[in-house]
């Protein structure tokens, strides 16, 4: 495993040996010990947002997008209307989910380097009383932009509407307190800032809203009301759970708490981000976002303009030096992305910068 590349991606990401070793044990999906493992995971997840008194944690098999679709399909009534706030590819995905589910929705889109503002949301809600829910990406992973969640949440509360937060790339590293930020649902997954492996999403659903959601869901497997009710009654998952993923997440959460929880995880990622930004700037690579709206999760860089630069060749050369990058998902500008998260520290980030510099020299890329 020592020769395995470091994943500088927004998830899946590099995991610890302890987390990987936790998957060497097989679990019976209906066994009491596994039920206790699931309950412990949910309890620890709720503690991160101080949400035990206000929200249920409902785990779901699959990717984070499965959980996002389940949250919208379960919690938005069939006669509801969702305002989708978009400034990147994952906001676009929220809108596509609403369309496929047959939920009425409207969109408000800003440029990929412009956060949605609370004033925007205030105006949009004042103009359309039919809106029941607002769906927001906290950290838009396609660029790394951070949207102003606390301010937007208060505006939504003021209008008496309900907030659904896709916190896939922020949960566990950026503070979100359920006692201070009103939301009906917050969605995240195992393979991001918690440094588990992919395969399980989870939804923090406001207790009263979840209780009232019976019959809303478009799907049996993605019915969060039924999933929670069955778990509350039996301690078990309704359908075969990703046992090894749950075990890995339980171990990753132990390491999360040993490290110092959210403040320590945030600080390490912030240090990684600073090392990355400073190092890339020193070799002439420009970041896509200004620092004040850059989340310490993933950084997007403008691609060099030199004709000798080709991303596929660049990617393979950097990979050969031990680092896996991520292509940009922007439609307007050619970019590439470098993640700051996973089991990596500032020294690893500096090594990645050095690898990028070496590759650009090898490719004779001069015009950056």
From Swiss-Prot:
Q: Which Gene3D superfamilies match?
A: Aspartate Aminotransferase, domain 1, Type I PLP-dependent aspartate aminotransferase-like (Major domain)
Question: From the UniProt record, which GO molecular function terms apply?
Answer: 2-aminoethylphosphonate-pyruvate transaminase activity
SUPFAM superfamilies cross-referenced by the UniProt entry: PLP-dependent transferases
Record keywords: Aminotransferase, Pyridoxal phosphate, Pyruvate, Transferase
Swiss-Prot/TrEMBL cofactor(s)? pyridoxal 5'-phosphate
Q: Give the E.C. number(s).
A: 2.6.1.37
Root EC class? transferase
InterPro entries given for it? Answer: Aminotrans_V_dom, NH2EtPonate_pyrv_transaminase, PyrdxlP-dep_Trfase, PyrdxlP-dep_Trfase_major, PyrdxlP-dep_Trfase_small, SP_NH2Trfase/AEP_transaminase
User: Per the record, what are the reactions this protein catalyses?
Assistant: (2-aminoethyl)phosphonate + pyruvate = phosphonoacetaldehyde + L-alanine
Q: Superkingdom of this entry's organism?
A: Bacteria
Protein's GO biological process = organic phosphonate catabolic process
Q: Which residues carry this modification: N6-(pyridoxal phosphate)lysine?
A: 192
Question: What family does the entry list?
Answer: Belongs to the class-V pyridoxal-phosphate-dependent aminotransferase family. PhnW subfamily.
Q: What does this protein do?
A: Involved in phosphonate degradation.
Quaternary arrangement and interactors, per the entry? Homodimer.
| The protein, known as | 2-aminoethylphosphonate--pyruvate transaminase
Source species, please?
Pseudomonas putida (strain ATCC 700007 / DSM 6899 / JCM 31910 / BCRC 17059 / LMG 24140 / F1)
Q: What is the lineage of its organism?
A: Bacteria, Pseudomonadati, Pseudomonadota, Gammaproteobacteria, Pseudomonadales
């Amino acid at each position: 495993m020592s020769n395995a590349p470091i994943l500088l991606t927004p998830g899946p990401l590099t995991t610890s040996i302890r987390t990987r070793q936790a998957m060497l044990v097989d679990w019976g999906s209906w066994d009491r010990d596994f039920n206790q493992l699931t309950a412990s995971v949910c309890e620890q997840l709720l503690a991160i947002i101080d949400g035990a008194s206000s929200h249920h944690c409902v785990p779901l098999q699959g990717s984070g997008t499965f959980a996002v679709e389940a949250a919208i399909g379960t919690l938005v009534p069939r006669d509801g209307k969702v305002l989708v706030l978009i400034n990147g590819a994952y906001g676009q995905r929220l809108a596509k989910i609403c369309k496929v589910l047959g939920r009425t929705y409207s969109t408000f889109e800003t440029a990929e380097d412009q956060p949605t503002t609370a004033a925007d949301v205030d105006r949009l809600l004042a103009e359309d009383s039919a809106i029941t829910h607002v769906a927001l990406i906290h950290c838009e992973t396609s660029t790394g932009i951070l949207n102003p969640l606390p301010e937007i949440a208060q505006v939504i509360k003021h209008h008496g509407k309900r907030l659904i937060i896709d916190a896939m790339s922020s949960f566990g590293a950026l503070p979100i307190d359920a006692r201070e930020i009103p939301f009906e649902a917050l969605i995240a997954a195992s393979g991001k800032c918690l440094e588990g492996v992919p395969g399980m999403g989870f939804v923090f659903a406001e207790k009263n809203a979840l209780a009232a959601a019976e019959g809303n869901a478009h799907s049996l497997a993605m019915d969060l009301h039924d999933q929670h009710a069955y778990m509350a009654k039996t301690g078990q998952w309704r359908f075969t759970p990703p046992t090894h993923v749950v075990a890995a997440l339980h171990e990753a959460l132990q390491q999360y708490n040993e490290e110092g929880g959210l403040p320590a995880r945030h600080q390490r990622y912030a240090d990684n981000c600073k090392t990355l930004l400073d190092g890339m700037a020193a070799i002439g690579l420009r970041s896509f976002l200004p620092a004040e709206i850059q989340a310490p999760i993933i950084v997007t860089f403008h691609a060099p303009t030199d004709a000798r630069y080709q991303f596929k060749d660049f990617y393979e050369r950097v990979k050969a030096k031990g680092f896996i990058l991520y292509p940009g998902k922007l439609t307007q500008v050619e970019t590439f992305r470098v993640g700051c998260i996973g089991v990596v520290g500032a020294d690893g980030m500096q090594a990645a910068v050095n690898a990028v510099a070496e590759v650009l020299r090898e490719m004779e890329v001069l015009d950056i």
